[in-house]
């Protein structure tokens, strides 16, 4: 269904349609289950990506996603790990690092290194930026922003917007032994010139090809 929809859009508007994929839709587990419509909660994401690429590239022998556009939509995978970066590279997709979830420079570098070992494309970086007339004004606007990291077990963390949402998430997945950590989100902030200089610095340090900004 996804391949057919994007092929149709690409046929109607060549060179103007991109397809972006993430591992989770966001929200609480009940919402995710409703969107899954009865499918297994933890399907093989890597195989799903390969199947989607097969339909988009018309490489599936037993099924085809019609129409077949003159120009196929460009594909992007959003992730925050070397595993996601390798998945994108092996499929020939562009990789977008989700720095708005994890802006740790060491993690960005590890993911980009994994991507570049396979792909010649420049990676993208998604982050949050806020510009105001002065740095002081920007600081006032974003000062109260918080992200609540829910720790469910070894290697299992989820970012939520409030302690209440974190507790509700744990309840819906049936976990009673959890921990909630209050953190500040990674935000590029200041006046316009400062935000621009921060983006330039990220570009030089990591070789970012494009930025996706949540503003």
Description of each model-found segment:
Residues 2-59, 101-103:
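Flexible, glycine-rich active-site loops centered on histidine and acidic residues
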Residues 6-17, 87-90, 112-120, 200-207:
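Acidic (Asp/Glu)-rich catalytic clusters
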Residues 17-21, 74-78, 93-98, 121-128, ...:
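Hydrophobic faces of well-ordered beta-strands that scaffold small-molecule active sites
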Residues 23-26, 79-82, 100-105, 127-134:
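Glycine-rich beta-alpha junction loops
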Residues 30-34, 89, 136:
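Short aromatic-enriched loop/helix-cap "lid" or pocket-rim segments at secondary-structure transitions
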Residues 39-65, 106-206:
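An alpha-helical appendage that flanks or caps ligand/catalytic pockets
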Residues 68-74:
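A local structural motif
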Residues 83-101:
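A conserved active-site cap/scaffold subdomain adjacent to cofactor or substrate pockets
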């Amino acid at each position: 269904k996804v391949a057919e929809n994007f092929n149709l859009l690409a046929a109607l508007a060549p060179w103007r349609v991109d397809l972006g994929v993430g591992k989770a839709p966001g929200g609480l587990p009940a919402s995710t289950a409703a969107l899954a419509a009865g499918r297994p909660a933890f399907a093989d994401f890597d195989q799903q990506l390969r199947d989607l690429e097969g339909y988009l590239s018309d490489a599936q022998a037993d099924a085809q996603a019609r129409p077949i556009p003159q120009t196929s939509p460009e594909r992007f995978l959003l992730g925050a790990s070397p595993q996601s970066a390798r998945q994108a590279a092996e499929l020939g997709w562009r990789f977008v690092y989700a720095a708005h979830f994890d802006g740790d420079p060491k993690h960005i570098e590890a993911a980009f290194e994994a991507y570049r070992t396979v792909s010649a494309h420049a990676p993208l970086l998604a982050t949050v930026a806020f510009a105001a007339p002065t740095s002081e004004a920007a600081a006032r606007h974003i000062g109260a922003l918080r992200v609540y990291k829910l720790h469910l077990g070894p290697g299992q963390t989820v970012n939520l917007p409030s302690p209440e949402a974190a507790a509700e998430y744990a309840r819906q997945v049936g976990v009673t032994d959890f921990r909630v950590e209050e953190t500040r989100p990674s935000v590029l902030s200041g006046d316009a010139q400062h935000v621009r200089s921060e983006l330039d610095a990220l570009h030089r340090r990591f070789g970012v090809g494009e930025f996706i900004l949540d503003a």
